[in-house]
Amino acid sequence: MRYVVFRLTHELKKRTGWFEKQFPIQPIHQDYISLEAWRHAQIPFFLQAMPARPYASLPVKTIDPPACLEGRIKFFNAVDKALGLDYDWLTHPLTGYRYSNKVHWSKVNDFSAEAGDIKYVWEKSRFAYLYEVIRYDAQHDTDHSEWIFNEILSWINANPVNAGPNYKCSQEMSLRLLNWTFALQYYKNSEHLTPELFSTIQYAMYWQAKHVFDNIHFSRIAVRNNHAITETLALYIIGSLYPQFPQAATWKSKGKRWFEAEIAYQVYEDGTFLQFSMNYHRVVVQLLTWAIAIADGLGELFQEVVYDRAYKSLQFLYAAQNDETGWLPNYGSNDGALFFPLNGCDFNDFRPQLNALHVMLTGHALYENGPWVEDAWWFRASLNGRKAMAPLERKMGWQVFTKGGYAILRDAETISFIRCGSHKDRPAQADNLHLDVWIGEQNVLHDAGSYQYNTTPDLVKYFMGTSSHNTVMLGHHDQMLKGSRFIWYH
């Protein structure tokens, strides 16, 4: 009932213009903190801590000049797109459709066949590609801060507050805020970060964070997945790191409480995840790592359930992981999301992210030394005085995760992974009894993946339906009745 009432109210606000009043386009510019004051503030960000060893000592290959410096961006961690150095942040790279930056975000149609999948416009605007440049600068002792700040300024100039496609999704804004924060901290003392530029950036950051807070119940009630975890965490972090922002204390306190509630609800007692997706579960692992690193810097603790579900998540994901490659079954929805690419490993290699969180919780590496230790280095991962959890050990034989509905059988050479359970929360795919089999490093029986969300009905039916899974079908019938978009009825 709460969901129905919220959706009806949300639609009414959209149709009556309420959102246009609540979220005004390009409000009057204000300064909340000066660059000098910000630089001298004792901001508890993990990058401020001196590394235990220099970047050069990490077992990382020589990093080539990032392709983004030439205008090439990797989309969904799979396909390079030559957007050019003067990309306008509004044009769909496949369809050529250009969104207006004068239309209020509530009027933007994000499911338009003419425009194409809006995620293609959102992808660069996440600013995850900045990590390529930051890693390059760390290894080569170079400074591309001017280029990075020009990218941020270009985005701000092209995207008036609360207008256009890049203000449509609060999760996208949250990721942008975290990635800008990381870059600002890394290049904090750059001569290219001028008072005028900092004023422009902090104005855009404030209004994006305010948007996330004022619309937080859309993700917490209508969506209730990794979006809600991302957004509530962003509120906690922005409220903590920018206390001069109006409402910062409220963002921090409510963001923390909501984040704890989302982790407790979305990560089940056995460490499985309500989205039934390995890749989205990795998204949560990265967000948990951010959360614990920031809280440690603040000298704060989350409710015990956060650390427990973080540890249980590692237990589940590690149980399904191939030791030779670091890959997991490509099970569930996978749109190529990797919010914070802080290493040079393959996208499908989960070792960097699992290791960073494992070090944070146990004080020990999960794997032998290799390029996958880089994430832990960036997060300055350590126990920081917290009680150590037991380091994970490889287990053979059966492991059953009843709440999520998975069974995993391992021996020295093979892994069998089967989905077998009921759904407490809405499923993304009709895939009960799906079987994944690994022999050595080869995934000989595997999931087909999920492709795109906004595509033709037949492709949606195939990738979300039973046909693309190793399981039983009666004729051409899916196991469940399909509803609209991501919905399965029964």
PLM regions and their residue ranges:
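Low-complexity, Ser/Thr/Pro/Gly-enriched N-terminal "stalk/linker" regions
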Residues: 67-107
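Pocket-edge structural micro-motifs
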Residues: 91-93, 131, 410-411, 419-420, ...
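Active-site rim segments in enzyme catalytic domains, especially the processed small/beta chain
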Residues: 431-490
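Carbohydrate-active enzyme catalytic cores, enriched for enzymes
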Residues: 272-275, 279-444
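Membrane-proximal basic amphipathic "stem/tether" segments
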Residues: 1-40
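Aromatic-lined, polymer-binding surfaces characteristic
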Residues: 101-310
